Structures are given as C-alpha cells and as structure tokens.
Amino acid sequence: MLKSKVHFWTLQILFVLLIIFVATKVSFVFQPFIVFISTLFFPMLIAGILYFIFNPVVRLLEKKIPRTLSILLIYLLFIGLLAFISASVGPIITAQVTGLFNNLPDYIKQIQALTKDLSHSQWFTWMMNQDYVSISKIEQSLTSFLQNLPQNITSSLSAVFGVVTNITLVIITVPFILFYMLKDGHRFPHLAVKILPASYRTEGLKIFKDLSDTLAAYFQGQLLICLFVGTACFIGYLIAGLPYALILGIVMAITNIIPYVGPFLGAAPAVIVGFMDSPAKALFAIIVVVIVQQLDGNLLSPLVIGKRLNTHPLTIILLLIGAGSFGGILGMILAVPVYAVVKAFFLNIVRLIKLRQRSRLEENAKPAE
C-alpha cells in the first residue's frame, strides 16, 4: 500500500515537472495568457481589497433588502460621496497642486543656494579631500545625467502615458469586477469545500470564514487608520502653518498603508516643504507626524485591528524588507495581509489535525472502557 502511494505521487511530481519543462520551451504559446493575466491583476487585486471592505456592509443591508439592491445602494452612496468630495475638496487640491508646481523653481533655487553654502563649508572641503571621493567621477556623472536628460524625459512621458492608460483601465473594470464579487462571492466557500470529504466541509467553511475575517479586519482597519492619520496630519500641518497642508495630508494617508516604513515616506515631503519655508516649520512637521504616529500605534491600531493579526513587529519588518526587494512598494503593501492569511490558514490546518487526532484517540479508547 505504501509503495503504491509513493509510486503514485512520484509519477504526479514527474508529470508536473514535465509540464513545467515543456512550458519553458514553448513559452510563446502562453504569452497571450500571461498578458491577459497581468492586465487583469491590478483590477482584480483592487476589487478584492474593496470586496473585503464593503462585503460586511452588504451582509448588514442584506438583512433588510435583497443582496443585489444592497450592492447598488452602496454604489450610489459611494458615487455620491465621491461627487461631494470632488466638489468640496477638488478645487482646493487643484489650487495647491498648481501652487506647488509654480513654486518648484523657487524651491530648486533654494536647494542650489543651500548646496552652494555647503560647498564652502569646512565639512565639504574635508570630504572632497578624502581619497574615496573623486571630483572627476562626480563631474562625469553629472555630465552624463544632463546629456541623457532629454531621453529620460521622453521615456518618462511614455511611462506616464502607460500609467494613465492602466489607471483608466482599472477605473473602468474594477466596478464591474467588484459588483460580481459582492453579488456571488459569498457562494465561493460553499463551492470550494465540495472538493473535500463531507466530514471535513464544516471545518473547511470555518477556515474560509477565519481567512475572510482576517482580511476584512486588516483592510477595514487600515482604511480607518489611513483616514485618521491623513486628517490628523492635515489639521496639524494647518496649525503649524505649513503650505499645501491638504496635499501633504493626503500623501501621509496614502503612504501610511505601508507599516513602519510608510510614515517616514509620507513625512519626507512635509519636512522638505516646511524647510523651504523655514526650519521651524520643518521641525513642527516632524512633531506633528510623531504625535499622530504615537496616537496611531498606541491607541488607534490596537483598538481598530486589535490582536487580530498577532504578529511581532520584528516579523513585520523582516517581511517588509523581503517583500520590498521582490515586489517593491506593492510587495510591501501586500506583505502583511498575505502573511496573515497564510498564518491563519496553517494555524487552522494544525487545529484541524489536532482535532482529528483527538477524536481518533477517543474512538480508540471507547472499546477499552
């Protein structure tokens, strides 16, 4: 019996390896499929995140009205909220973005003046006299950069066009994908557990529920935390007299999605803009960010997300380093929820195995009694 099982699984593994080998030799056959999957990856990812945010609301409304009508009602409320925000905040954002771009030449001049002052300092002179610093290499790098600047700008414009195209595709496709996820997503666990033996299906549904609750708690909690951080920083920047407070608050809210690293990324523009105005404002910007992050880390995050993820900070930092090296910013954003899901899955599997072992021991102990 054991030999037959080993023989069976050996053949299965060899068959899979053979398929992978053949696929690498005829990769052009799979190219259209790969392009199709890569095109739909971001819309599916965003729709999946929104599904875990909105699905609890749909389930709540479903108690009073049909599920499809609940989804349409959420869509209408969401569109109305976006329209209200665009009408009330849109002009302010436009004015601040325009002002920021108009002031960029002045900021560049200030940076150049600061660099010139530093070049005459004793520290800079000492640095230039070190053996590991080569003025000729620095000049060559600057010359090469300036010579390639037109080509870099052209390639950047092409990249911007590609980004705009992808964003347009996401905006068009995500609402449709999300609608059908919200409409039929609750049926998926019941369909998936049908591949399991009947005695395991109840436990399988519990595992699906635990994974869903973990993701929902994380994404909903992150949404609330980002809104709090962005709003609090905006108010703090206003009190500190920082220019472009709204834009800088939005940047802080967006970058806060990345644990630990995000606040530093979001604070950098505020500190730079504040420093261009006065060093005191840069210091105030740092104080605002520190206070908001203390409130977030010690009060809000434990209340909103709680002990749900139960992950040590060192583990998260290591995850961010590894995920950032492989997947960049996207990898850092997805590292924690993916780890939480994998961890919850394996913990449930271990729990299931222990339950089965205990039930077998109890069954074997019955005849002895």
Swiss-Prot record:
The chain crosses the membrane at residues 13-33, 34-54, 73-93, 159-179, 213-233, 234-254, 271-291, 316-336. The keyword Transmembrane helix applies. It holds the Pfam family AI-2E_transport. It comes from the Bacteria. InterPro entries: AI-2E-like. It is a multi-pass membrane protein. It is found in: Cell membrane. One of its GO terms (cellular component) is plasma membrane. Belongs to the autoinducer-2 exporter (AI-2E) (TC 2.A.86) family. This is Putative transport protein YueF. It comes from Bacillus subtilis (strain 168). The gene is yueF.
